[in-house]
Curated annotation (Swiss-Prot):
Domain of life: Bacteria
UniProtKB keywords: Amino-acid biosynthesis, ATP-binding, Cytoplasm, Kinase, Nucleotide-binding, Proline biosynthesis, Transferase
Gene Ontology process terms (BP): L-proline biosynthetic process
Keyword Kinase: yes
Reactions catalysed, as given in the entry: L-glutamate + ATP = L-glutamyl 5-phosphate + ADP
Any single GO CC term annotated in Swiss-Prot or TrEMBL for this entry: cytosol
Annotated positions binding substrate: 60, 147, 159
One Gene Ontology MF term: glutamate 5-kinase activity
Record family assignment: Belongs to the glutamate 5-kinase family.
Positions of the PUA domain: 285-363
Pathway it works in: Amino-acid biosynthesis; L-proline biosynthesis; L-glutamate 5-semialdehyde from L-glutamate: step 1/2
Entry EC number(s): 2.7.2.11
Annotated protein name in UniProt: Glutamate 5-kinase
Amino acid sequence: MIEVVDGQRKLSECKRIVVKIGSSLLTANGQGLDLDAISHWAKQIADLHNAGHEIILVSSGAVAEGMVRMKLASRPTDLPSLQACAAIGQMGLIHTWSSVLENHSIRTAQVLLTHDDLADRRRYLNSCDALQNLIDWRVIPVINENDTVSTDEIRFGDNDTLAAMVAGQVHADLLIILTDQQGMFDSDPRHNPDAKLLSTVRAMDDVLFEMAGGGGVLGRGGMVTKVRAARLAAKSGCPTLIASGESDNVLSRVMAGEMLGTLFTTDKDRMTAHQQWLAAHLQTAGRLVIDDGAVEAIKLKHRSLLPVGVKTVEGHFDRGDVVECVDKQGKRVAVGRVNFSSRSAEIIKGLSSDKVYQVLGEARSLEMIHRDHMAIY
């Protein structure tokens, strides 16, 4: 049985909030955008905005709208067709959000992001600055993945993940993921009528993954992706609330203090800006398999990774590239900027610090990855 945390942070005190709304809550059962539903969401968002909260909206629905405009009976399965649908549907999606929020005298801005935008340090910082300016101007960013130019290998994969990464990027106080499910249950409610809704859990609890199910037809994100997103946000010190968007006035009620959905809390302090950028790397240049001693040194003692703790070097990378560190079971432990190329790392792996100098024949850093350039999972 999963451990449940006592108490819940007063969500009304959260100022900067990333709100992600799934496709099923914005479309008329897949038949294009539901204007009435979106207008209803706009009213709730406007209420929070006018109460002084800073709202960043991550909106799904572009592919579903594109399907209707192109009269497609089913969601495409190949990437080029999905990208084309997203490009067509994005026009209607952003126009609709702009129109309904303008009715509340709120300006919006379209922001399309790719994984490359967040993996490249300069582009990451530029997008941070742009988002901060929009927030300062009291403009609500409407964010979506730039599906048209994303490749299959480097996609976020779902807007839950994108929302979590944006939450870290803007230093959000809270991430709200609205879905067609009530929240996290202690077992699958579709098969167990006695399943109980969990009000508060620790985001980093591995047991959560054992409870998650699959995604729907229109969207890409099931409960598994939402749990993964909550963990990603938690690494940036941001809690996540997963709640049913089918509940009446859910945003207003949650921010008024009503206990709805499941709150995923974080035990970690907020990462530094540099660590948050490192954590944003879903794809890395290579991989270092490390031993149990290195895992303990990194996770429990917050030490740098030394060559002696590296068992295997995978991939081809240069000095300064971002690589991931995994344990012997392949579970990600950390990501960081490596001080050696893959060729040098292969030579010095498993060596004690005093032998590194002898083997390389030059004076340089003794750490494979310094702790200041590492984001721990």
